[in-house]
């Protein structure tokens, strides 16, 4: 998993150089969302359910 993540970040940096203004904001948002999903999966058993519901509401607003 770590290897896959690393390669992905590398390709993203290349893409960022091409289109700086727009891609920067977009990539940042995507990263935040992804990290949140991963966290919920790890902790998920204790209070993951309530968190999932909350994230769903937020996603709709996005």
Swiss-Prot record:
It is found in: Nucleus; Chromosome. One of its GO terms (biological process) is chromosome condensation. Residues 1-62 are annotated as: Disordered. Keywords: Chromosome, Developmental protein, Differentiation, DNA condensation, DNA-binding, Nucleosome core, Nucleus, Spermatogenesis. It comes from the Eukaryota. One of its GO terms (cellular component) is nucleosome. PROSITE patterns: PROTAMINE_P1. One of its GO terms (molecular function) is DNA binding. Its main location: nucleus. Testis. Belongs to the protamine P1 family. Protamines substitute for histones in the chromatin of sperm during the haploid phase of spermatogenesis. They compact sperm DNA into a highly condensed, stable and inactive complex. This is Sperm protamine P1.
């Amino acid at each position: 998993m770590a290897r896959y993540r690393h390669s992905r970040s590398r390709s993203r940096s290349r893409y960022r150089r091409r289109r700086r203004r727009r891609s920067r904001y977009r990539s940042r948002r995507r990263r935040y969302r992804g990290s949140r999903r991963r966290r919920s999966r790890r902790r998920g058993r204790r209070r993951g359910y309530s968190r999932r519901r909350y994230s769903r509401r937020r996603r709709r607003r996005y």
